[in-house]
Regions:
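S/T-rich, low-complexity, solvent-exposed segments of bacterial secretion/appendage proteins
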Residues: 1-495
């Protein structure tokens, strides 16, 4: 049968275990306002029993582990939805920033300027020889071109801003993955129970930030290490204690940054594989969304040039001259902007046209000869005074169907093409706004759920503290009783 000394060790184990558990409670209370902190729980277990004859005697209590209270599946869901939220936020912010200019319905808007241009031909048709009408028409044509080019440059500026952000975001991703790999090493090599909990919290916070930058998949190994890949699976960012950087290098084609991954000497282009997070949104904006709006402006410019030139042109001796619009790269008036430049291969004999090259808007200009001599504006088909047939025909093009091919979505009038652009812009703005709001609400709900599981509850900690205090007091009282018995034994037999 164990003696009084063994009983003292029983009481001592109780004191030590309650004190260790109280330290955990104190650590929780101290970090109640620490961002990303996960509350910890002291797990106590009975000591291994000893056998004396046929009787088992307990050996007290030990602190078996200190557990961080976390839901790993909830963390993974937060990583996934956070990437979607920041992606939607970035897309909405960018599209909303251009909506006031591109979707302007006032006098400086695309619709008003295109309408004013065709109205200029309508005015000219009422008095074809009127010099003031001709000068006014040229001013409206110039205003329309300037307006289109200004809108196009705005989109170019937005693309350049997105490209600049891509380089910075890639740097942030690499910094975070490097820090996560270092924490993986600390977590995997720590043998003291509970000693890696704070490192896990730091890693969780860093992974939250990483998910805001790029969509990721996270798998935790039995040793506690995170393996992180792009959500597409195309590239590994972190595995064990190693981080693999993304690289952003300028392309020789368009000068924009292209993102790639280099793992074990194998370079993989991941530009199109990154869909979510701030980085995915910036790539999407630069390469797809903003380019789509530019394509609509190009189609509109090509349609105007094609339709107006086909009516305004003059054929003398089999040579076509006197185009109203010209390419700025071919500034001589006899060349102008050839009407064939915009013909879609599938629609060359039909009424639809689309641009064959990007940046059509920036090349569009009024024929320099016409600018120098407004009398070259062709109002009629012949030399008869008052002939207004061509001016009237061009004026009617403004609302005529089948003048602009909208990127495979159908053939529209100029007014329809402008309306489609404004509608598309408005639809995308509202879509991204709705996605942003929905994702913010979802992530907020998930964060609240995480806080309810992993956050520090002061009422709960106060209750635990009182329970442990009573346990400590009871162990101390037990030791005091055993000490008294020991004194009595010594006094009784030590005389």
């Amino acid at each position: 049968m164990p003696g009084l000394n063994a009983s003292l060790y029983l009481g001592l184990s109780g004191l030590q275990a309650q004190q260790a558990a109280l330290n955990v409670v104190g650590h929780n209370i101290a970090n109640v306002n620490t961002p990303g902190y996960t509350r910890q729980r002291a797990d106590l277990s009975a000591g291994q029993s000893q056998v004396e004859g046929q009787i088992y005697f307990g050996t007290g209590v030990t602190l078996s582990s200190v557990q961080g209270i976390r839901d790993r599946f909830l963390d993974l869901q937060i990583y996934r939805e956070t990437a979607k939220q920041t992606g939607a936020d970035e897309r909405y912010a960018a599209v909303n920033a251009i909506s006031s200019s591109l979707g302007d319905t006032g006098s400086t808007g695309i619709a008003a300027q295109v309408q004013a241009f065709f109205q200029g031909f309508q005015d000219l048709s009422t008095n074809p020889e009127n010099a003031a009408f001709r000068t006014s028409l040229l001013g409206k044509a110039q205003a329309m071109i300037t307006g289109l080019q200004t809108k196009y440059r705005l989109l170019d500026d937005q693309r350049a801003n997105a490209d600049q952000s891509i380089g910075a975001l890639v740097g942030e991703v690499n910094t975070l993955t490097g820090q996560i790999a270092q924490l993986n090493q600390r977590i995997a090599t720590e043998v003291t129970p509970g000693a890696n909990n704070d490192a896990r919290d730091q890693r969780k916070t860093l992974t939250d930030k990483l998910a805001g930058l790029v969509g990721i998949n996270v798998v935790e190994s039995p040793k506690g290490e995170y393996q992180i890949t792009l959500d597409s699976g195309n590239a590994v960012l972190v595995t064990g204690t190693s981080a693999f950087d993304l690289t952003a290098k300028r392309s020789g084609n368009d000068g924009y940054l292209q993102v790639s991954s280099n793992m074990a000497g194998t370079v993989v282009d991941v530009n199109s594989a990154i869909k979510e997070g701030a980085l995915g949104a910036k790539l999407d904006l630069r390469d797809n969304i903003l380019v789509g709006f530019q394509a609509q402006l190009d189609q509109l410019a090509a349609g105007v040039a094609k339709a107006v030139n086909s009516v305004h042109q003059t054929v003398v001796g089999g040579l076509t001259t006197n185009y109203f619009f010209q390419s700025s790269t071919e500034a001589n008036g006899s060349n102008g902007l050839p009407v064939s430049i915009t013909a879609s291969p599938a629609l060359q004999s039909g009424p639809g046209w689309s641009t064959l090259f990007k940046g059509m808007v920036n090349l569009l200009s009024v024929n320099s000869d016409i600018l120098a001599n407004p009398s070259l504006i062709t109002a009629g088909t012949g030399l008869a005074v008052g002939d207004n047939t061509k001016a009237l025909a061009i004026a009617q093009l403004g609302s005529a169907a089948g003048t602009v091919e909208m990127g495979g979505t159908g053939i529209a009038s100029f007014t329809g093409a402008v309306a489609a652009l404004v509608t598309d812009l408005g639809t995308q703005t509202q879509t991204y706004k709705a996605q942003s709001t929905a994702q913010q609400n979802l992530v907020s709900a998930l964060q609240s759920q995480r806080d309810s599981i992993s956050g520090v509850n002061l009422d709960e900690e106060a209750s635990n503290m009182m329970t442990l205090q009573r346990g400590y007091q009871a162990s101390a009282r037990f030791i005091s009783v055993i000490n008294q018995l020991t004194d009595q034994l010594v006094n009784q037999f030590g005389k």
